[in-house]
């Protein structure tokens, strides 16, 4: 693998995983709120 490709992909992957983590956390909170009713 080319090092430049890795340098370009690392921040993109970090941002995508952070967004996915936040979305999953909010979704789980919504589901638990629906289940507690």
Curated annotation (Swiss-Prot):
UniProt keyword DNA-binding, yes or no: no
Transmembrane intervals: 5-23
Membrane topology per record: Single-pass membrane protein
Organism superkingdom: Eukaryota
Membrane topology (Stromal): 24-37
Compartments where found: Plastid, Chloroplast thylakoid membrane
Lumenal side stretches: 1-4
InterPro entries, A to Z: PSII_PsbY
GO MF terms held by the record: manganese ion binding
Listed GO CC annotations: chloroplast thylakoid membrane; photosystem II
Statement: the UniProt record of this protein carries the keyword Transmembrane helix: yes
Keyword terms: Chloroplast, Membrane, Photosynthesis, Photosystem II, Plastid, Thylakoid, Transmembrane, Transmembrane helix
One Gene Ontology biological process: photosynthesis
Family, per entry: Belongs to the PsbY family.
NCBIfam families membership: PRK13240.1
Subunit composition and interactions: PSII is composed of 1 copy each of membrane proteins PsbA, PsbB, PsbC, PsbD, PsbE, PsbF, PsbH, PsbI, PsbJ, PsbK, PsbL, PsbM, PsbT, PsbX, PsbY, PsbZ, Psb30/Ycf12, at least 3 peripheral proteins of the oxygen-evolving complex and a large number of cofactors. It forms dimeric complexes.
General function of this protein: Loosely associated component of the core of photosystem II (PSII), it is not always seen in crystals. PSII is a light-driven water plastoquinone oxidoreductase, using light energy to abstract electrons from H(2)O, generating a proton gradient subsequently used for ATP formation.
Protein name, UniProt field: Photosystem II reaction center protein Y
Source organism: Guillardia theta
């Amino acid at each position: 693998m080319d090092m430049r490709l890795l340098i370009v992909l690392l921040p993109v992957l970090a941002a995508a995983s952070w967004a996915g983590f936040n979305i999953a956390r909010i979704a789980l909170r919504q589901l638990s709120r629906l289940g507690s009713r």
